[in-house]
Amino acid sequence: MVCTEFIETQRLYDQMHRVQRIRKLQQDIAIIENVLYNPSGMKWSDMPRSQNPNDDKKTKLMDDKAYKEKKLDIEKKMEQAEKHILEKIIEDISLLPENPKGPMNLVLQDVLRYRYLNGYEWEEIMKLMFPDNDAFIDMAESNLRKLHIWNGKALMKFIKCQQK
């Protein structure tokens, strides 16, 4: 891949990783809330009446939760702004000339949206795009190869649209 092509597709990869970071932060916050608000019998501090409130485990958890929520808000704002720009570029793929064998631009747009804007793993995309072929392992491998080929074609079309 040429350096300029790498730079042009890097926005997609950055967006995918941003979506994954958002999911991880949401999971972390849910775990902290579960520990904080469920009576699990957890010992909150080492001493019965701690003189130093900074040693209090509950305070540390609440601070950690506040930090992660702030970080989550920042990531979500960045994700929404970038998603809007990338969605416009992906929409432009439908304006490119179609392959005479069949309309593929919509499929390629779906692959880009699922993988990079929504941050889905390849197996999740395969289940969405090929829902009937779950039972056969050979079909799953074949469909996964198709997805990778479509991803390559979609990235090339994304580059063409971005250069306009």
Model-derived features with residue positions:
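N-terminal interaction/assembly modules
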Residues: M1-P100, F130, G152, M156, ...
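Residue-level marker of regulatory loop/turn positions in helix-turn-helix DNA-binding domains and
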Residues: Y67, M104, L147
